[in-house]
């Protein structure tokens, strides 16, 4: 086992990366090794998909399936070795199909297929034991003894960034947003990474290419969400329980939430969001359901306690999943799509009757708690509608600075920085937030600036697209570069979606971003220095010192 993709991976003077019987996330060495083989097989699929395109062969099924399968290897998504093996077997079948089609087309056109890499010709062993024995040969840090550690670091930056983009591609696909040009670019990059490139300049360029590709993917996802569910509107959300039977929906998939709301109408079941599903309350086509009663719980790392105390059924639509046996709620948990845990019920298709039956069999909440409301729904359209008023307050000198404080949450005590930062930000500053990092402070009171709330919840992690649109609008209004705006991004990272959003911001030319709580373990000190110099990236430090430096600039 070797896994170094998330923020909580082992980092000591002697060891970097999880390389023992179990990773810090809870996945076993078996699952980790199987995921490595799946990724390698997917790189072979991408080689033949790219080669097929040269012969005008496009397989929509494979194009849409491949990023989804890659998504299954993202942190805290799938811990089930049987499911990973099934995906790997399917990948091998797709690879063989594409290879056969390309070979036939090449023969018919009298084309010589030269320079076929090992990743394209590799044959998947025919048993789980043989696959596991083969896994060390395709570990994500393969070749580490032959190349400089900076090469491995940049390969991983690209691989993990592309994995984050693949996750957003799958979220978009669920909402019927697909794009063959983006799939072609994905396959080209994935296949190239499978050849173990060594040129640092090319790898850096590739990371920027991934960032720009992801910007287009986030635009697709924004289009899918707003076309399907309407543009989010500022909406108050109760974060306390309501008496009655209940279902909790966690993850990111708004499609699943809608299906659950439709199928629970009139059944006396209250539906709650959790974690990154909180922004769902702002969408007109979702908030119209009166039994979508509120949000329960906070960020992913608290789920083992919060889910254990939730007296109903729980649906995990995407990341982040933790071991449900710790809180003894595995019998009330249902996974969807690429999510998996051994022994936990998995739902294929859109029939949630099992979830409903489970919810009706549970006690539910026995009484109402005193309501506590927070506000969500400040996504792209709402932000753009508010832009004239915001610009006016800036011109009057009432808004001096903008902060975007958000990203992934996690366990580390250092993450209290983000709570303290928002608390100490001057009252003439506006704070935008997104992703689950918001749970560090989104129940606190921030007041307003002449009617404009000081805390604006932009949405899920992918709604960084909305924040970018506001920044571009402000830059246009003030006739300046985006880096000349009184705007500072203060981001927290945990997994690969955060990595690709950072690459997107870098690729768009955004500089001076503060990141934390720690640097990615897969980046060497030399690579961190290069990124800091090239993009003026800064590590978070002391809140007071950071605020002083930001506001003095």
From Swiss-Prot:
EC number, as in UniProt: 1.7.99.1
The protein's required cofactors: [2Fe-2S] cluster; hybrid [4Fe-2O-2S] cluster
InterPro entries, sorted: HCP/CODH, Hydroxylam_reduct, Prismane-like_a/b-sand, Prismane-like_sf, Prismane_a-bundle
Annotated GO CC locations: cytoplasm
Superkingdom assignment: Bacteria
This protein's UniProt keywords: 2Fe-2S, Cytoplasm, Iron, Iron-sulfur, Metal-binding, Oxidoreductase
A Gene Ontology BP annotation from the UniProt entry: response to hydrogen peroxide
Cellular localization per UniProt: Cytoplasm
Catalytic activity: A + NH4(+) + H2O = hydroxylamine + AH2 + H(+)
Annotated positions binding [2Fe-2S] cluster: 3, 6, 18, 25
Modified-residue entries (Cysteine persulfide), positions: 408
UniProt entry tagged with the keyword Iron: yes
Cofactor note: Binds 1 [2Fe-2S] cluster. Binds 1 hybrid [4Fe-2O-2S] cluster.
Protein biosynthesis found in the keyword field: no
Binding site for hybrid [4Fe-2O-2S] cluster: 252, 276, 320, 408, 436, 461, 495, 497
Enzyme class: oxidoreductase
Single Gene Ontology MF annotation: 2 iron, 2 sulfur cluster binding
Family affiliation: Belongs to the HCP family.
NCBIfam families reported in the protein's UniProt record: hybrid_clust, PRK05290.1
Function: Catalyzes the reduction of hydroxylamine to form NH(3) and H(2)O.
Protein name, per record: Hydroxylamine reductase
Source organism of this protein record: Vibrio parahaemolyticus serotype O3:K6 (strain RIMD 2210633)
């Amino acid at each position: 086992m070797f896994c170094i993709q998330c923020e909580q991976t082992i980092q000591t003077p002697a060891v970097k990366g999880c390389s023992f019987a179990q990773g810090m996330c809870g996945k076993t060495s078996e699952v980790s090794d199987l995921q490595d083989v799946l990724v390698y097989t997917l790189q072979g699929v991408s080689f033949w998909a790219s080669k097929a395109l040269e012969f005008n062969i496009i397989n929509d099924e494979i194009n849409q399936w491949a990023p989804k399968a890659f998504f299954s290897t993202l942190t805290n998504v799938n811990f089930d070795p049987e499911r990973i093996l099934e995906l790997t077997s399917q990948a091998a079948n797709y690879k063989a199909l594409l290879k056969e089609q390309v070979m036939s087309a090449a023969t018919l056109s009298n084309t010589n297929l030269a320079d076929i890499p090992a990743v394209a010709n590799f044959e998947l062993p025919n048993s789980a034991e043989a696959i596991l024995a083969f896994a060390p040969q395709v570990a994500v840090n393969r070749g580490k003894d032959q190349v400089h550690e900076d090469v491995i670091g940049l390969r991983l930056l690209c691989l993990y960034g592309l994995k984050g983009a693949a996750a957003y591609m799958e979220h978009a696909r669920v909402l019927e947003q697909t794009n063959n040009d983006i799939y072609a670019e994905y396959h080209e990059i994935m296949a190239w990474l499978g050849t173990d490139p060594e040129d640092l300049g090319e790898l850096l360029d590739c990371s920027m290419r991934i960032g720009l590709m992801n910007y287009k993917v986030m635009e697709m996802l924004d289009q899918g969400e707003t076309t399907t569910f309407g543009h989010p509107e500022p909406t108050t959300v109760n974060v306390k329980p309501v008496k009655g039977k209940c279902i909790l929906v966690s993850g990111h998939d708004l499609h699943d939430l809608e299906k659950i709301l439709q199928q629970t109408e009139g059944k006396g079941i209250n539906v709650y969001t959790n974690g990154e599903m909180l922004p769902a309350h702002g969408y007109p086509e979702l908030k119209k359901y009166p039994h979508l009663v509120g949000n329960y719980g906070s960020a992913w790392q608290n789920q083992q306690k919060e889910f254990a105390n939730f007296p109903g059924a729980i649906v995990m639509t995407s990341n982040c999943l933790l071991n449900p046996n710790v809180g003894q709620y595995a019998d009330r948990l249902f996974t969807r799509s690429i999510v998996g845990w051994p022994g936990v019920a998995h739902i294929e298709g859109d029939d949630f009757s099992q979830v409903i039956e489970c919810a009706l069999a549970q006690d539910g909440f026995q009484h109402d708690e005193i309501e506590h409301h927070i506000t969500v729904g400040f996504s792209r359209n709402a932000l753009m509608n508010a832009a004239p008023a915001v610009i006016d307050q800036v011109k009057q000198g009432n808004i001096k600075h903008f902060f975007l404080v958000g990203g992934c949450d996690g366990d580390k005590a250092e993450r209290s920085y983000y709570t303290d930062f928002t608390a100490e930000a001057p009252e003439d500053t506006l704070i935008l937030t997104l992703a689950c990092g918001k749970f560090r402070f989104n129940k606190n009171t921030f007041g307003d600036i002449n009617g404009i709330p000081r805390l604006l919840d932009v949405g899920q992690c992918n709604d960084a697209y909305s924040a970018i649109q506001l920044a571009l609008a402000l830059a246009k209004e003030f006739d300046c570069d985006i880096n000349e705006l009184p705007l500072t991004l203060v981001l927290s990272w945990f997994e690969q979606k955060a990595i690709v959003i950072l690459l997107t911001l870098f690729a768009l030319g955004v500089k001076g971003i503060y990141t934390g709580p720690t640097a990615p373990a897969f980046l060497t000190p030399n690579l961190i220095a290069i990124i800091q110099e090239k993009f003026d990236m800064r590590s978070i430090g002391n809140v007071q010192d950071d605020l002083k430096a930001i506001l003095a600039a």
